[in-house]
Amino acid sequence: MRHSGREAVPQKLVWNIKEVLFVKHFISRRNFLKAAGVTAAASAMAAAVPQASAGFLTGKDAAVTILYTNDVHTYIDNKSPKLTYAAIAAMKQGYVDEGKPVLLVDAGDHIQGTAYGSMDDGATIIELMNEAGYDIATLGNHEFDYGMARAKAIIKEADFPYVSCNWVDLRTGLRVLPAVKLFPAGGKWIAFVGITTPESFTKSTPAYFMNAKQTKYIYDILGGDDGRKLYDAVQKAIDKAKTLGADIIIGLGHLGVDPSSSPWTSEEVIANTTGFDAFIDGHSHTVMENKQVYDAAGKAVTLTQTGSYLANVGKMTIAEDGAITTELVSTADVSDAAVAATAEAWINDVDAMLGEQIATTDINFYINDPATGKRRIRMGETNLGDFVADGIYTYFNEVEQLDCDIAMMNGGGIRTDVDAGKWTFKTCKQVSPFGNVACLMSVTGKQIQ
């Protein structure tokens, strides 16, 4: 937004603003490879990927390991010491090879966040998760970012089931997905209850939950102003898991612990229900190895979350007596070659499509506090937020000649820091991956006030 006292935006950054602000590509990895004449090679590579997803069925060890991720946001190009899907695949396969029961689960927000997700609407990310051997996942709010039809298509493309106890079709009154899924492991039945944040309405696009004419909502993510609709849906799912014979019940939720998400946080859900033994969370990007939260009956429930962007992978161990421990793993010295090849091929494709340099800058742009690394965007002013808003202002005034007085950009649509150096189209995609449309409105000063 244009205002006095804002942080300075460097004048050395020069580009064609019209090209940058409205660049958008829709091309699938498969179509790109087909155009390049290498479809056969890609198919052969995919066929060579070892299938380890049934390892939990053969494991005889009484202790059960659950590997978990959340808010990966398509960060597939992580370098050491950060993790990758190839590392996770190898970690899981290690347990399978030793005959130990293991499950690999995700708590949502995996198909959106960088150009590696938006360039094919999450198709390659699902391919990587399939190859890595994921056993179950829940939907985060960003799984809806490519539209309702695409969200449903992603569920079909996945080799693993999605669960959500509170996503309902208002036309039928029925859940869109199963609420709970049970797995046999280590002589126990382990149940996962899926939960999607009701904030999906506002943190995705409300129109995606409406009919084609956008006259009424046809989908709901149950929440309730006081949280009761959410708590009731979760409790019903827990009770169903018990009826089905679950020995251990784990919440697989995309809720978070940020107070701004109240009354729909994971802590509030635990406090208003009974029956969870543990809760694997997402949404707030919180690093939380193990927090004890008391449920409505006074029982301590283990709450855990890995942070975001594959900075950590969670490891939950369920002992023979049912005791649960958790730890966060931030490095890995193993890698699955086939999964790594799939990721590298797509990274190279995207980098080639978006690699043209369009600008340079001699300063760092940030959305996170440079001193602490904690999120600052959406909570205060950042120089990248100022720059994006100034870019919109410049576009309307200097390119379209539309006499814009004020430009605003929602902080949640600015997604990454940018180091000093060259800017490419990929950089722009990483900063603003949602493909938002810039709009011009005529309002009075009183309305703004």
Language model regions located:
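N-terminal secretory signal peptides that target proteins for export/translocation
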Residues: 1-2, 23
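N-terminal amphipathic/hydrophobic targeting modules at extreme N-termini
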Residues: 2-3, 8-10
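Non-catalytic terminal accessory segments
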Residues: 9, 13, 17-18, 22-64, ...
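Polar helix-capping/helix-linker motif
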Residues: 49, 231, 336-337
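Membrane-proximal interfacial segments on either side of biological membranes
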Residues: 332, 338-339
